[in-house]
């Protein structure tokens, strides 16, 4: 059916109200077709000391995405920003992202997350692909890719994720039945957080944690709390010079290191268990780590390092889009009903072969793309340019840090007509691959891309064919930058059984 449902809210505010603003991207059309030097790129200026005070006061920079969005409004589709002695160039057009992708080397580089690197160095631990550049990154990445991104790997882990998604559905049904009103209103974020940890841990280590019930064991609860703590403290440490934060943020550093220590110990125990199973004749079930151990192409230190990063990286990147998708579907009941009809029509085929969810649910896949357009988990993608490039008629030299703003791209009316409206159908009608960059691109795309897609598709498929999702909240959810883009508070959602 034709989907014309639209949110009653203007998601691009407050910038649409600014009298000085213009449509994003107009500067490129007005610029003469002549090469300009790097120094001619419009510069965004802020007092460095005031910026530091703001970060200290906020314990991070919750409005970073909005600040950069406003800068695009003022300066056009490309600008540069000084971060100390480092110049960062910000861009936000799909054609620029495509040009950067085409110029990528076989081992693209980006700046490394300093607080995480500091923990590994202080503890004498190896680093995985998320914290590596150069030949070592490429060596690790080429050996992990087949077990995370290949069709063969997806075929292996889809039934595992489906099992967890079905268990979550049963958990939700019990909660609803236990309620005298025959419905359930809840803050869904913690449930989604636990679901993604449960599913990812099962795929990585072949072991269930038991996070879908009400009574978590103390070890699992500490594990969940430690992952939450890492996500909370990381942005407080990454936006200021490390020398300064080590002097004024010792409590935050300690919390971050203690949390990493606990997660590292937890992951190490699981990797060792898998190793012992492989050595004694083979694991009981397929898992990513069992494949890496059996293959023997990576050292145990490298397997431990990558297991740690895959565990930490599998949480908010999936749970936030799930919450925001359910929220938008609750605000757009016509879209929700169309998705439900699609899931009910595909129920038999997906039940027989869960992998069919990837092909038989095109509208649901479009819904996820639309959610990630409005609420990209990563505010921007980063590259350190390996060669000189001409971007928007400006010369940008090799070695420059480039940030591609996904938040502003998703709100650009020149790229997405009526960007303030929630219109999943737009993704059924377009082919631009560089308009959907949530999981990155090229050889450095998100390693957990396929797993995240499967986790989201199957969970939403099972929940939406069984429940109507409603909300009384009509206003926009305030999104804040906390290492990933997340809601400042999770919207209250109500689940009612489908009659």
UniProtKB/Swiss-Prot annotation:
GO molecular function, one term: steroid 11-beta-monooxygenase activity
PROSITE patterns, sorted: CYTOCHROME_P450 (PS00086)
Gene3D superfamilies: Cytochrome P450
Residues reported in the UniProt entry to bind heme: 446
Keywords: Heme, Iron, Membrane, Metal-binding, Mitochondrion, Mitochondrion inner membrane, Monooxygenase, Oxidoreductase, Steroidogenesis, Transit peptide
Primary subcellular site in the record, as a coarse category: mitochondrion
Stretch forming the transit peptide: 1-24
One BP annotation, GO: cortisol metabolic process
Membrane listed as a keyword: yes
EC number: 1.14.15.4
Superkingdom as given in the UniProt entry: Eukaryota
GO CC term (a single one): mitochondrial inner membrane
Root EC class: oxidoreductase
Cofactor: heme
Membrane topology: Peripheral membrane protein
Compartment(s) of residence: Mitochondrion inner membrane
Reactions this protein catalyses: a steroid + 2 reduced [adrenodoxin] + O2 + 2 H(+) = an 11beta-hydroxysteroid + 2 oxidized [adrenodoxin] + H2O; 11-deoxycortisol + 2 reduced [adrenodoxin] + O2 + 2 H(+) = cortisol + 2 oxidized [adrenodoxin] + H2O; 21-hydroxyprogesterone + 2 reduced [adrenodoxin] + O2 + 2 H(+) = corticosterone + 2 oxidized [adrenodoxin] + H2O; 21-hydroxyprogesterone + 2 reduced [adrenodoxin] + O2 + 2 H(+) = 18-hydroxy-11-deoxycorticosterone + 2 oxidized [adrenodoxin] + H2O
Biological or metabolic pathway of the protein: Steroid biosynthesis; glucocorticoid biosynthesis; Steroid hormone biosynthesis
Function: A cytochrome P450 monooxygenase involved in the biosynthesis of adrenal corticoids. Catalyzes a variety of reactions that are essential for many species, including detoxification, defense, and the formation of endogenous chemicals like steroid hormones. Steroid 11beta, 18- and 19-hydroxylase with preferred regioselectivity at 11beta, then 18, and lastly 19. Catalyzes the hydroxylation of 11-deoxycortisol and 11-deoxycorticosterone (21-hydroxyprogesterone) at 11beta position, yielding cortisol or corticosterone, respectively, but cannot produce aldosterone.
Family: Belongs to the cytochrome P450 family.
Protein name as annotated: Cytochrome P450 11B1, mitochondrial
Protein's organism: Mesocricetus auratus (Golden hamster)
Gene that encodes it: CYP11B1
């Amino acid at each position: 059916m034709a989907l014309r449902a639209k949110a009653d809210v203007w998601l691009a505010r407050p910038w649409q109200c600014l009298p000085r603003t213009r449509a994003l991207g107009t500067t490129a059309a007005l610029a003469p077709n002549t090469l300009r030097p790097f120094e001619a790129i419009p510069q965004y200026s802020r007092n460095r000391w005031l910026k530091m005070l703001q970060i200290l006061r906020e314990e991070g920079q919750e409005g970073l995405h909005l600040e950069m969005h406003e800068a695009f409004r003022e300066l056009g589709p490309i600008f540069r920003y000084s971060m100390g002695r480092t110049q960062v160039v910000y861009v936000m057009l799909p054609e620029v992202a495509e040009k950067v992708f085409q110029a990528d080397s076989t081992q693209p580089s980006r700046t490394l997350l300093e607080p995480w690197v500091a923990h590994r160095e202080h503890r004498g631990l190896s680093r995985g692909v998320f914290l590596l550049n150069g030949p070592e990154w490429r060596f690790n990445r080429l050996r992990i890719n087949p077990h995370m991104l290949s069709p063969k790997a997806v075929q292996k882990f889809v039934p595992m994720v489906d099992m967890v998604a079905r268990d979550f559905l049963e958990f939700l049904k019990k909660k609803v039945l236990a309620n005298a009103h025959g419905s359930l209103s809840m803050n869904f974020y913690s449930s989604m957080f636990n679901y993604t940890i449960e599913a990812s841990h099962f795929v990585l280590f072949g072991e269930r944690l038991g996070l879908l019930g009400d009574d978590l064991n103390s070890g699992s609860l500490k594990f969940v709390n430690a992952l939450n703590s890492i996500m909370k403290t990381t942005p407080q440490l990454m936006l200021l010079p490390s020398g300064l934060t080590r002097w004024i943020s010792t409590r935050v550093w300690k919390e971050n290191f203690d949390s990493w220590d606990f997660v590292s110990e937890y992951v190490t125990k699981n990797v060792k268990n898998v190793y012992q199973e492989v050595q004694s004749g083979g694991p009981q079930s397929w898992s990513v780590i069992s494949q890496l151990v059996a293959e023997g192409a990576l050292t145990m230190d490298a397997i431990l390092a990558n297991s740690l990063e895959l565990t930490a990286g599998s949480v908010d990147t999936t749970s936030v889009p799930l919450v925001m998708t359910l929220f938008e579907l609750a605000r757009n009941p016509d879209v929700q009903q169309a998705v439900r009809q699609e899931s009910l029509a595909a129920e038999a085929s997906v039940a027989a072969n869960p992998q069919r969810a990837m092909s038989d649910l095109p509208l649901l896949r479009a819904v996820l793309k639309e959610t990630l357009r409005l609420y990209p988990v990563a505010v921007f993608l980063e590259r350190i340019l390996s060669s000189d490039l001409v971007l928007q008629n400006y010369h940008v030299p090799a070695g420059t840090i480039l940030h591609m703003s996904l938040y502003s791209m998703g709100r650009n009316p020149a790229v997405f007509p009526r960007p303030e409206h929630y219109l999943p159908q737009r993704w059924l009608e377009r082919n631009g691959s560089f308009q959907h960059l949530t999981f990155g691109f090229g050889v450095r795309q998100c390693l957990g891309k396929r797993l995240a897609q499967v986790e989201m598709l199957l969970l939403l498929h099972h929940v939406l064919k069984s429940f109507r999702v409603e909300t009384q909240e009509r206003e926009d959810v305030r999104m804040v930058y906390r290492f990933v883009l997340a809601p400042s508070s999770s919207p209250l959602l109500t689940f009612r059984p489908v009659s």
